[in-house]
UniProtKB/Swiss-Prot annotation:
Similarity comment: Belongs to the clarin family.
GO process annotations (BP): actin filament organization; auditory receptor cell stereocilium organization; cell motility; equilibrioception; photoreceptor cell maintenance; positive regulation of lamellipodium assembly; sensory perception of light stimulus; sensory perception of sound
Spans through the membrane: 8-28, 101-121, 135-155, 186-206
Protein name: Clarin-1
Length: 232
């Protein structure tokens, strides 16, 4: 492939990576990962509410990795509330999983920025055939994509398996018990998914630029070595 086309492809991949890094930085600080509705089970059972009457006992919340806000309703009007995970909810949430989500998000940002620099270096510089070259680009794209995947899996497990929304809604609520009715992932979560997809796409762009996948290259080299051994 002509060098000019390689420059264009690597520049595109670099721009995609930079956009991903900015997106993840923004997503990390916004309370737009999950939007949930919660039912005040205690109040609904007391008055035997059903149908449209349940709307009086339905609250909602949205939150991210550090803070969030919502409204509790238990038949006596809306009660707005705000919360932060650190230090307010440390005793209520699975801390190890939550910290790992933040940690892998930070690693994803760093690796994506490094990947951006590597793509631009390959576009305009004279890269070595080791980590600065295609091998490094493949490696960074794979690790970054894996980090993005881990962030989504860990956060989804925290929300669905450990019932994060219920724990937040019931935090310091001694009288009423809240039950999650619905949850949906919002903007910030899908930014991580988009970033995961972009790293997969960048791997295809590297291949499109004319560089073999690492495992394909090693397989060809192994075949050559076997042929050389047979000759002797």
């Amino acid at each position: 492939m002509p060098s000019q086309q390689k420059k264009i492809i690597f520049c595109m991949a670099g721009v995609f990576s930079f956009a991903c890094a900015l997106g993840v930085v923004t997503a990390l600080g916004t309370p737009l990962w999950i939007k949930a509705t919660v039912l005040c089970k205690t109040g609904a059972l007391l008055v035997n509410a059903s149908g449209q009457e349940l709307d009086k006992f339905m609250g909602e919340m949205q939150y991210g990795l550090f803070h969030g806000e919502g409204v509790r309703q238990c038949g006596l009007g809306a009660r707005p509330f705000r919360f932060s995970f650190f230090p307010d909810l440390l005793k209520a949430i699975p801390v190890s999983i939550h910290v790992n989500v933040i940690l892998f998000s930070a690693i994803l940002i760093v690796l994506t920025m490094v990947g951006t620099a590597f793509f631009m270096y390959n576009a305009f510089g004279k890269p070595f055939e080791t980590l600065h070259g295609p091998l490094g680009l493949y490696l960074l794209s794979f690790i970054s994509g894996s980090c993005g995947c881990l962030v989504m899996i860990l956060f989804a497990s925290e929300v669905k398996i450990h019932h994060l929304s219920e724990k937040i809604a019931n935090y310091k609520e001694g009288t009423y018990v809240y039950k999650t009715q619905s949850e949906k992932y919002t903007t910030s979560f899908w930014v991580i998914f988009f970033c995961f997809f972009v790293h997969f796409l960048n791997g295809l762009l590297i291949r499109l630029a004319g560089f073999q996948f690492p495992f394909a290259k090693s397989k060809d080299a192994e075949t050559t070595n076997v042929a050389a051994d047979l000759m002797y």
